[in-house]
């Protein structure tokens, strides 16, 4: 009987580990923050280029950034969100704009 008890405990531990592994990844909001210098057209370009929005949705989000101070551009896993933030910030600097893209836990 000792062996059956040990086997049962081992199965329970394995089941617990599988449940832990099946948790969905943490998600993060990628956020564009308003500034007084970046042209609206550039923000629209960023939203189309890095987030694949059409012109109408990109314009709506740009106006949200402009009037509300920030807008969520998308919700992604940590790795994808970090990559988007780096890409957008690099693109803004290369084009000499102070546009700031950040991430926050969703």
Curated annotation (Swiss-Prot):
Comp. bias regions, Polar residues: 1-13
InterPro entries, sorted: ClpS, ClpS_core, Ribosomal_bL12_C/ClpS-like
Record field: transmembrane: none
Signal peptide positions (record): none
Region (Disordered): 1-21
Alphabetized Pfam families for the sequence: ClpS (PF02617)
GO annotation, biological process: protein catabolic process; proteolysis
Function: Involved in the modulation of the specificity of the ClpAP-mediated ATP-dependent protein degradation.
Similarity-based family: Belongs to the ClpS family.
Record's subunit section: Binds to the N-terminal domain of the chaperone ClpA.
Name of the protein in question: ATP-dependent Clp protease adapter protein ClpS
Protein encoded by which gene: clpS
């Amino acid at each position: 009987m000792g062996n059956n008890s040990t086997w049962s405990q081992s199965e329970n531990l394995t089941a617990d580990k599988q449940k832990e592994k099946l948790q969905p990844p943490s998600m993060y909001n990628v956020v564009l923050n308003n500034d007084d210098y970046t042209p609206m057209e550039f923000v629209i370009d960023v939203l189309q280029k890095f987030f694949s929005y059409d012109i109408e949705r990109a314009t709506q989000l740009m106006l949200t950034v402009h009037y509300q101070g920030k807008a969520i551009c998308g919700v992604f896993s940590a790795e994808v969100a970090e990559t988007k933030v780096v890409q957008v910030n690099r693109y803004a600097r290369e084009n000499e704009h102070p546009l700031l893209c950040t991430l926050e836990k969703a």
